[in-house]
Each structure stands twice: as C-alpha cells, then as structure tokens.
C-alpha cells in the first residue's frame, strides 16, 4: 500500500523522443545542443510526448539552421484559432560560431546534420541534440552489428564462467 503523503514526481522524464535510426545510419564525430523555436500548441503536445524524430533532418538556409520533417502531432484540445501544422520547419537556436562551423563542414566536407534526441533542460526548455557526421556504408553497419553481438556473447560467457 502506498502512503498518502508519498510524493509523486510531477516532472516528466528528461528525454522526450529519440531518433533510434540515427546511430545505425550515421557515424557522428561531433554533437551539439540546440534550442528550438516553438509555438504554444507544440509545447503542449511535446509535454504529452507526441513527437516523432525518425524522418527528420537539419538543413541550413540563409545562415540559420532549421529542423525539417519532425512531426509534432497537435492535441485535440489545442486552440481552434491557431492553424496547427505538424510538419512545419522549426528554427534551431545556435550560436553564430556553431552555425559557421556546421555550414563549413556541410558544404566543404559532405557532412550531414541529424537530430539524435529531444529532451527537457531544467524542465522548462526543449533542447535538441544534433549530430554532425557522415553516413555509414552497408559494410560498416554489418561490422557494428557483429561487434555488438560479440559484446553480448562475451558478457554472457563471462557471466556463466563466473558461476
């Protein structure tokens, strides 16, 4: 039985959404934390967890970074006087130095910018972790899978050997 005075955590978990395919499809060399410019209905939907990062990517236009393809499904109880576009481009808030670095690497060296996860910072701001990396080839993906399976098998063997 639970106590009546037991404190329940009113804070939602820190991670809102993850792009699970990102680590499988890309080899990241550097990661950045970016803020998001959101509307009120988007924040409400994010608090409920109606976010999908799987098909999204970041592109640079006019010296600014934008998140494209991220789906934030509007709530049924959202305001009726605001037109909710779940697939709109959302501006990323980065420092000028970070934007210049990303711009240079993407244009000159063929890097891609991919969102990795969305999370709460201090339970007030929505942050997006983006990764700067290159796409993996098919043989790289197979090597990663073999390495992961070998680690699992090795840990099982060590566990049984300790008995």
Swiss-Prot record:
It is found in: Cytoplasm. Pfam families: SmpB (PF01668). GO terms for molecular function: RNA binding. Residues 135-156 have a biased composition (Basic and acidic residues). Keywords: Cytoplasm, RNA-binding. GO terms for cellular component: cytosol. Gene3D superfamilies: 2.40.280.10. SUPFAM superfamilies: Small protein B (SmpB). InterPro entries: SmpB, SsrA-bd_prot, SsrA-bd_prot_CS. GO terms for biological process: trans-translation. Residues 135-163 are annotated as: Disordered. Required for rescue of stalled ribosomes mediated by trans-translation. Binds to transfer-messenger RNA (tmRNA), required for stable association of tmRNA with ribosomes. tmRNA and SmpB together mimic tRNA shape, replacing the anticodon stem-loop with SmpB. tmRNA is encoded by the ssrA gene; the 2 termini fold to resemble tRNA(Ala) and it encodes a 'tag peptide', a short internal open reading frame. During trans-translation Ala-aminoacylated tmRNA acts like a tRNA, entering the A-site of stalled ribosomes, displacing the stalled mRNA. Belongs to the SmpB family. This is SsrA-binding protein. It comes from Shewanella loihica (strain ATCC BAA-1088 / PV-4).
